[in-house]
Regions:
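Bacterial Sec-dependent N-terminal signal peptides
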Residues: 1-22
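Short N-terminal segments immediately surrounding and downstream of signal-peptide cleavage
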Residues: 18-37
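Acidic, small-residue rich beta-repeat scaffolds with periodic aromatic anchors
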Residues: 24-26, 45-50, 54-56, 72-159, ...
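Beta-propeller blade termini
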Residues: 188-197, 242-252
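Acidic/hydrophobic-patterned starts of short beta strands in beta-sheet-rich repeat architectures
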Residues: 196-210, 252-255
């Protein structure tokens, strides 16, 4: 039904070239004496922001949602937590941040609870090196057109397509064109995400793409890593074979999640080494077992070598 609805929407849209740009920034620091990791997503041309944070001792699985406003180098964020009640888990506002973005890309300010009777100092340092290369000084424009692509019913249907991304500097000069691809979009907006995906401190480019011929896992990214020496973005097709990935700036690893919807899950964790990436850990859960299988690897001679496997 979802796919049919999407096709119906496409028929109603008027063609317009639109490019959405979101920058993903990661911060490490403390609320009072308690270490936290915070992620903020900033949309170019908008003052709304969203993200999450977690206390290091609790782990990323206990992340707390954030949304708010970025204006005049000040960020105000409201946190939402799920509270257990007799009616189940209910989302409630449990606190807020009021932060100032410093010239060295620190965030300083306060956190206070919803009742405003508790208040703590907050200090956070950006993990990305924005002083060296700040992509907010650049603009991005897709070439978007209509084309026919085979859908999951094996029929050709009209979709918005992208085949080029032009990058301009603050002087409106075109500095690079990313091309050599031809992919469908899920709507009429081309989406760029700027995130450090190889953990060298510099923001890279992720281009969202859509697979109309799939029922599951119908979205992914094209990945372009910024080459500091060449001062340009270089496509990483090997990374694209893993499709939709999640990047952990604190631990400098990324993960691919797989699930079949029946209780079988497979998480694969990777690390970078010498401009390549390697499998370092696998976690498998099975629908017919209460135990989880863990497999650990070490990088030896440019290969992932299994060193340990256990259940718990």
């Amino acid at each position: 039904m979802k796919k049919i609805f999407v096709l119906f929407i496409f028929c109603q849209l008027t063609f317009a070239q639109k490019t959405s740009v979101t920058t993903v920034l990661h911060f490490s620091g403390k609320i009072d004496k308690y270490p936290i990791e915070l992620t903020v997503n900033v949309s170019q041309g908008k003052d709304s922001v969203y993200g999450s944070y977690y206390y290091t001792k609790n782990g990323k699985d206990m992340s707390i949602s954030l949304k708010g406003i970025l204006k005049n180098e000040e960020i105000k964020l409201i946190e939402t937590s799920y509270i257990s009640t007799k009616k189940g888990n209910v989302a409630k506002n449990t606190g807020s941040f009021s932060l100032k973005l410093k010239s060295n890309y620190e965030l300083n300010g306060i956190w206070q609870n919803e009742k405003k009777d508790k208040q703590f100092d907050v200090t956070l340092q950006c993990l990305e090196n924005l002083a060296e290369f700040n992509q907010k000084n650049y603009t991005y424009k897709f070439n978007i057109y209509k084309g026919k692509v085979e859908n999951f019913n094996n029929q050709l249907s009209d979709y918005y397509m992208i085949d080029r991304l032009d990058i301009y500097n603050s002087k409106k000069e075109k500095i690079q064109t990313l091309s050599g691809f031809k992919n469908a979009l899920s709507d009429n907006i081309g989406q760029v995400e700027l995130e450090d995906i190889n953990f060298d401190g510099l923001l890279d480019i992720k281009i969202y793409i859509y697979f109309p011929d799939r029922i599951r896992d119908d979205g992914s990214f094209l990945y372009y890593i910024y080459d500091k020496t060449k001062k340009e973005f270089v496509r990483n097709t090997k990374l694209e074979k893993l499709e939709y990935l999640f990047f952990d700036a604190k631990n400098k690893e990324f993960v691919r999640y797989e699930a079949d919807g029946s209780g079988n899950e497979h998480d694969m964790y990777y690390k970078w080494s010498n401009n390549n990436f390697y499998l370092i850990r696998e976690v498998k859960a099975f629908e017919d077992s209460s135990k989880t299988l863990y497999t650990e690897y070490q990088i030896k001679n440019n290969k992932s070598v299994k060193v340990k496997e256990y259940e718990k």
